[in-house]
Regions:
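Secreted/extracellular ectodomain signature
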Residues: 1-204
C-alpha cells in the first residue's frame, strides 16, 4: 500500500514500508515496526528531516527522548504534501461516522494505525493490538463499556493501537502509541477519528 501511495505522490523511485508491528502467533514471531523501516534518515514531502535514525525516531536514550523527533502536525504530511486533518480543524457532529467521513475529505482523520508500543516494538500476544495482525475487520460484541475507547475498556477484543502525527487526542497523544480503536471495521475506526491511515517510511 505504501508503495502505491508513493507512486501516486511521485516518489516511487524509493522502496517504502508501512510502520506496522505484528504480534507473535503460534509458529510466527512478532515483528517490530521499528525493524521494518530501514535506518534513516527520513524526510517528509517538503524535504524536512523527521528523524535521523531509528533511535532518534523513538527517543531510545534520555538525551534523544528530550530532543524528540520532528514529527508534528505541520511536518507529518501525506504523500501529496498535505497536512492530516486533526482535532478542531473541521468540526462536524458526524465526523466520527464512517458514511460521512468517507465522502468528506476535510474531517478529523488523524489516527494512524501502528499496532506498536512507544519504543516501536510489538505488544505481547495476550491481547489484540493489531486487528489480528492486520487480517481482521471484526468489531467487539455489544456489551458494557461501549462508551469509551481503547484497550483499557476492551481487553482481548478486536482492536488496533494508533498514534497521532499531531500528538493531539486521547490517550497520551503519542505519535505511534496513544490508544486503541473501538474495533477493526471502517465504521469502528471512524468512531475515534481514523480512516486506516499508515505511516510510510523509505527503507533505502
Amino acid at each position: 500500500h505504501c508503495q502505491n501511495l508513493a507512486e501516486a505522490g511521485g516518489a516511487d523511485d524509493r522502496t517504502w514500508q508501512a510502520y506496522l508491528s505484528t504480534q507473535a502467533r503460534p509458529g510466527q514471531p512478532a515483528i517490530d515496526a521499528r525493524d521494518r523501516i530501514g535506518t534513516g534518515p527520513w524526510y517528509n514531502f517538503d524535504g524536512i528531516m523527521i528523524a535521523r535514525d531509528v533511535a532518534h525516531l523513538h527517543g531510545d536514550t534520555i538525551e534523544l527522548a528530550r530532543l524528540g523527533n520532528n514529527l508534528t502536525k505541520r511536518t507529518g504530511l501525506t504523500e501529496k504534501g498535505q497536512i492530516v486533518p486533526g482535532l478542531n480543524d473541521y468540526k462536524h457532529p458526524q465526523d466520527d461516522v464512517w458514511e460521512y467521513v468517507r465522502t468528506t475529505p476535510y474531517t478529523n482523520r488523524h489516527e494512524i494505525l501502528t499496532g506498536s508500543q512507544l519504543d516501536g516494538t510489538a505488544f505481547p500476544s495476550e491481547l489484540d493490538y493489531t486487528c489480528d495482525n492486520w487480517t481482521s475487520n471484526a468489531d467487539p460484541e455489544p456489551g458494557p463499556n461501549q462508551g469509551g475507547m481503547g484497550m483499557g475498556l476492551y481487553p482481548g477484543r478486536p482492536n488496533a493501537q494508533i498514534g497521532f502525527p499531531d500528538r493531539n487526542g486521547g490517550g497520551d497523544g503519542s505519535w505511534n502509541s496513544s490508544h486503541g480503536t473501538r474495533g477493526c471495521s471502517q465504521t469502528a475506526l471512524a468512531m475515534t477519528h481514523g480512516v486506516g491511515k499508515l505511516y510510510c517510511f523509505a527503507i533505502d
